[in-house]
């Protein structure tokens, strides 16, 4: 009987992790995606994607060795080298740049959240604490997202909840 309970718990955790990865990838794709030949990025992130996509393309289309920033000639690469190199290699091998970028980003965030889940679960002994820890990670140090969700449930106004394009809450952005 104990083995059956462990098997059920494993399936629930596995389903949680699969859904978590799907959610993370969906959020990544929502911010950075291709539509035909146009590359789209989120309103608050487009400035950050410019040097990253240039660096990725310097590996996928060119021979950027010794490695330098395309935007800042002569400057040694200080950070994100392996991420950009790996995304460049994936694009070189045929994967679209948005999928390569989002897949690595989603896998990295997912791996961190899996570790957070197991740390919280191991620390307290409760699966629910692990799940709550993962959910709270997305709350930006406030309950504004949960507050917005509760308001949508109470008012029944799901249209404004799903179509919201402005920052919510009381934290700085």
What residues fall within each predicted segment?
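Membrane-proximal intrinsically disordered regions of secretory-pathway and membrane-system proteins
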Residues: 11-18
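Membrane-embedded, hydrophobic transmembrane alpha-helices
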Residues: 1-11
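Active-site lumenal/periplasmic loops and adjacent helix-entry segments of GT-C-fold
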Residues: 20-173
């Amino acid at each position: 009987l104990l083995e059956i309970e462990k098997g059920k718990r494993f399936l629930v955790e596995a389903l949680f992790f699969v859904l978590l990865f799907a959610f993370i990838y969906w959020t990544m794709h929502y911010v950075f995606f291709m539509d035909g030949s146009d590359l789209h990025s989120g309103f608050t992130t487009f400035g950050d994607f410019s040097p990253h996509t240039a660096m990725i393309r310097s590996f996928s289309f060119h021979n950027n060795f010794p490695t330098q920033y395309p935007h800042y000639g002569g400057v040694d690469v200080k950070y994100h080298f392996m991420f950009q190199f790996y995304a460049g290699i994936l694009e070189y091998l045929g994967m679209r740049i948005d999928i390569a970028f989002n897949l690595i980003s989603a896998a990295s965030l997912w791996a961190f959240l899996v570790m957070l889940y197991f740390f919280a679960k191991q620390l307290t002994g409760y699966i629910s604490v692990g799940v709550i820890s993962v959910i709270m990670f997305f709350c930006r140090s406030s309950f504004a997202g949960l507050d917005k969700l509760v308001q949508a449930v109470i008012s029944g106004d799901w249209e404004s909840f799903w179509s919201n394009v402005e920052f919510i809450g009381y934290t700085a952005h």
